[in-house]
């Protein structure tokens, strides 16, 4: 069955791009006007959990909350696997009935969410590491370890454009209107046009930009390898404020209700007040002193992330420990949350389902190889890749 005819009714609306802009790529035309937002002193950040039918970028949404509204079955079973030719560290994107994922072989692959059949493969020319695809208006964007940012036709896998951005890219693209925000190891955060890849502006930091930017109120937020958390205005690339994290950060910030949450390599999780522009609290496990590489998932009651201490940590929004769950190896996968359950991979080769309330294990699946990629959730299904090149779908 072809890509057009396999789209579910639920995903048809989200995928109406497949019947438009095939011959002329012009994402999100705004009549030449780029809408900017006023930075309010009260700084409201209204979390918008990911719609049930889509997981269109890393962490699901602009705020990087890692939370889906999808109704996932209480009892999971493996539905299909796809064998890539190399490791999968990239986290998948799901739009309607289509899955997009990058591989270390340098391929961006589009698959059928229902059965895992391949629609197309795009050759990036360089390995794809942790950069995860982002979909917008008929195009899929992804970075590679050669420093290239690619725009690919979501229907047929043909290249719209590609552009070199200084150095290797492990950050994931985030599409905001007709602009793409993405970090590079050349120490810059880039703002690039979706139409042709031209650089609109770039912001210089003092270290590699590994973090994927979170977006709220017209600002891009990055937690940096230079130990600084920054708010950058998307309209012109100017820094609005910064906060010292006190340590190197490899994780991306999750934004919710005026706060940003992320872990550091100084073994801490930080809660940063965006209104006060200061660290509101710091969490550190009392015994196990290991870095946090996993990006947090955030709900109205919990901050959940993995640690290199082999634990999944569940915190209250005030930074107090609510629970921990022990795995057998580092947890570098970033958790996803749906329906009161936490979904996360571990380098012990297992995919875990935990209670959001108390961290109790509800289910596990042994993949037999490290799972450092993060789950994507949409249409009642969960997709995650492994270090041995297998892409799993559960439902």
Please place each PLM-identified region on the residue numbering.
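Beta-propeller domains
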Residues: 104-113
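Extracytoplasmic beta-rich repeat domains
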Residues: 52, 62, 80-95, 105, ...
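Intrinsic disorder/low-complexity segments
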Residues: 1-51
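Short loop/turn segments that connect beta-strands within beta-propeller blades
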Residues: 112-116, 153-156, 193-197, 233-237, ...
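Residues marking helix boundaries in flexible regions
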Residues: 23, 34, 216, 233-235
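Blade/loop signatures of beta-propeller domains
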Residues: 49-79
């Amino acid at each position: 069955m072809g890509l057009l005819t396999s789209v579910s009714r639920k995903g048809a609306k989200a995928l109406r791009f497949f019947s438009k802009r095939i011959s002329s790529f012009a994402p999100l035309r705004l009549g030449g006007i780029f809408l900017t937002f006023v930075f309010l002193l009260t700084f409201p950040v209204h979390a918008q959990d990911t719609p049930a039918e889509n997981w269109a970028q890393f962490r699901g949404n602009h705020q990087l909350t890692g939370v889906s509204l999808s109704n996932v079955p209480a009892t999971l079973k493996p539905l299909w696997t796809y064998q890539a030719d190399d490791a999968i560290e990239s986290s998948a994107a799901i739009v309607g009935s289509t899955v997009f994922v990058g591989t270390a072989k340098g391929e961006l692959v589009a698959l059928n969410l229902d059965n895992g059949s391949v629609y197309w493969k795009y050759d990036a020319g360089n390995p794809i590491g942790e950069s995860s695809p982002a979909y917008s208006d008929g195009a899929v964007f992804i970075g590679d370890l050669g420093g290239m940012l690619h725009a690919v036709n979501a229907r047929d896998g043909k290249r719209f454009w590609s552009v070199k951005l200084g150095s290797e890219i492990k950050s994931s693209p985030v599409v905001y209107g007709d602009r793409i925000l993405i970090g590079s190891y050349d120490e810059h955060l880039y703002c690039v046009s979706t139409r042709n890849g031209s650089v609109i502006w770039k912001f210089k930091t003092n270290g590699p930009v590994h973090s994927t930017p979170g977006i709220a109120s017209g600002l891009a937020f990055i937690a940096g390898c230079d130990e600084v958390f920054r708010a950058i205005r998307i309209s012109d690339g100017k820094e609005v404020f910064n906060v010292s994290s006190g340590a190197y950060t490899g994780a991306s910030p999750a934004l919710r209700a005026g706060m940003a949450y992320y872990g550091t390599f100084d073994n801490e999780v930080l809660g940063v007040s965006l209104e006060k522009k200061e660290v509101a609290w710091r969490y550190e496990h009392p015994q196990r002193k290991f870095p946090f590489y996993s990006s947090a998932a955030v709900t109205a009651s919990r901050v959940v992330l993995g640690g290199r201490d082999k634990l999944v940590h569940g915190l209250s929004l005030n930074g107090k420990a609510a629970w921990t769950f022990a795995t057998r190896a580092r947890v570098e996968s970033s958790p996803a949350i749906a329906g009161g359950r936490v979904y996360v991979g571990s380098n012990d080769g297992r995919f875990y389902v935990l209670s959001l309330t108390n961290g109790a294990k509800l289910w596990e699946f042994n993949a037999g190889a490290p799972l450092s990629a993060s789950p994507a959730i949409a249409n009642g299904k969960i997709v995650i890749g492994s270090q041995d090149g297998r892409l799993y779908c559960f439902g």
